[in-house]
């Protein structure tokens, strides 16, 4: 594990993550409009179901899987990865599948705002159930506020105020961040190719179990709640995809090197399996 930590520390890709995360969430804040949030809030049943699925059902599933696979080296990682659904890929899929884009944006916005509280709360619960995991509550909360909440709040505020530079910078940031995510999709796995190959067999069962469980739970619960097809599609996409940069950020903040490896494998499986399935399936 020490060798793995050295490889993670030496990764140029991972060193850029903490710098780019605030930029990413600032941009997200500038793209969030009050109108889209109001539109989403009008359907309270769908919004309540969607937000509860993200901040309660997914983390709870991660905790359950971590207990089932407690002897696996990545048992802690699966619990943490499911704290960060959505992300860049989910937004693209929602657009292509003609899902509920305001719902997708609002989900990401709300979960970003409350993420310091929800993440720390779930981390506390995880630490109780997994003896090998400990973390500093105050330090982690402050780091998440600085990296996620404040940049998002600043972006939302300047957009709400209609400041002239927002529109001028938005196109640049949009292209920059898309390029950045594309680049790290290749550079991250390339830099860490040896541990990815070494630990692939240990992680793949957890990843597949997670994806299948999410799919089945979401489809069953959405039928019980009786939400529209477009909303169902959007929520499923958000749940199946993983916020790659956030997962890597958590691995750095919490000093869990194996989580970076698991996060990359989870992300790659999402790209290779979930994305084609989502695009092909009606």
Show which residues each predicted segment covers.
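Alpha-helical transmembrane segments of multi-pass small-molecule/ion transporters
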Residues: 1-282
